[in-house]
Amino acid sequence: ATELGLKVALLDRRSHIGGNAYSENEEQTGIEVHRYGAHLFHTSNERVWEYVNRFTDFTNYVHRVYTRHDGVVYPMPINLGTINQFFNAAYSPAEAKALIAEQAGELAGTDPQNLNDKGISLIGRPLYEAFIKHYTAKQWQTPPEELPASIISRLPVRYTYDNRYFNDK
């Protein structure tokens, strides 16, 4: 709009702009408070990255997520490190892909009707039950067997040791 000399009207239902990315300085301390949680911006679109960098500086941050299963901590999303640690193995990427395909084939030839079966058909029962099933039930407050399969279309599995949650900027 600035480059074209256009005017923009911005409407927000809240008393401030910024949506969930809103932050404000706390009066007494001057500390910036993120009212709706931490702000993580990431994109793989170079034009978007260049555009937003015209307006602000970004702090380099790599988001990593870990989960616990049976008292052991694993990196997420599921990657080659997760697979090898979980199965106490040293699979190559090709071997890990073959293992997951074999385990996911348990429901081959069926049309998954719920999230539970869809998850198993995507990554196999062992990984699904260890890392997805209970988290999903907690997140949705509903057993995965009662959730529609359409909720998940894929479960990311990386066949590298890259354990960054987002693999873009």
Could you say what each language-model-derived stretch is?
Residues 2-27:
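Glycine-rich FAD pyrophosphate-binding loop
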Residues 70-72, 80-169:
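Active-site/ligand-binding neighborhood in enzyme catalytic cores
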Residues 29-106:
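Dinucleotide-binding Rossmann-like beta1-alpha1 core, especially the glycine-rich loop
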Residues 18-19, 37, 124, 141:
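Glycine-centered flexibility sites
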Residues 21, 45, 132:
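Short, flexible helix/strand-to-coil boundary loops that buttress conserved ligand/catalytic motifs
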